[in-house]
């Protein structure tokens, strides 16, 4: 995840991480310029690009097509917008998509669970192909939302992850590395 919004710093970090793992990578920034610098550092890998929004979808689509990478779509708590972005991106030519309807660990947790459930039901039970893509959840938000003791943040992250796994999340972005947090 780019925290500095600095393309050169991000490129260097991505290169260093890629040299030290064969695991799948996810490059996270809403700034297409920053993401492109990271993608240039690892031309033979296919990281998940995170994320297209209503404001940057075209630039992100260009990156996904140019580098042949999957693209996450982020539309927090707005399933109509999420579906619209999926339609727009597929018509633009992006085929590998991952959907992020937003994750909330405190206020809005019920909305998070409902959104994941409604998306999966629409995709599976109602045949809505636009909502049939994999779902990504971000329990890592517990660390930003709680602002308290690390143990409390880790606990919140663990229960949000458990709920999302039970409600159809295919990918989770976690902060904690403690075994008890990763059990879900």
Q: Residue ranges of each PLM-predicted region?
A:
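Catalytic alpha/beta core domains of metabolic enzymes, predominantly
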Residues: 55-184
């Amino acid at each position: 995840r780019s925290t500095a919004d600095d393309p050169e710093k991000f490129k260097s970090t991505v290169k260093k991480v890629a040299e030290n793992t064969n695991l799948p990578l996810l490059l996270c920034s809403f700034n297409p310029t920053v993401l492109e610098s990271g993608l240039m550092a690892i031309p033979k890998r296919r990281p998940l690009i995170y994320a297209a929004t209503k404001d940057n979808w075209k630039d992100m689509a260009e990156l996904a097509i140019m580098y042949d990478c999957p693209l996450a779509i982020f539309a927090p708590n707005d399933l109509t917008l999420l579906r619209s972005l999926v339609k727009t991106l597929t018509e633009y030519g992006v085929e590998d998509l991952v959907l992020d309807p937003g994750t909330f660990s405190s206020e809005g947790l019920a909305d998070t669970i409902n959104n994941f459930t409604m998306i999966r039901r629409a995709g599976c039970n109602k045949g809505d192909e636009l909502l049939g893509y994999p779902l990504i959840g971000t329990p890592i938000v517990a660390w930003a939302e709680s602002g308290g003791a690390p143990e409390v943040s880790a606990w919140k992250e663990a229960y949000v992850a458990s709920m999302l796994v039970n409600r159809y999340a295919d990918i989770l972005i976690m902060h904690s590395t403690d075994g008890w947090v990763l059990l879900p």
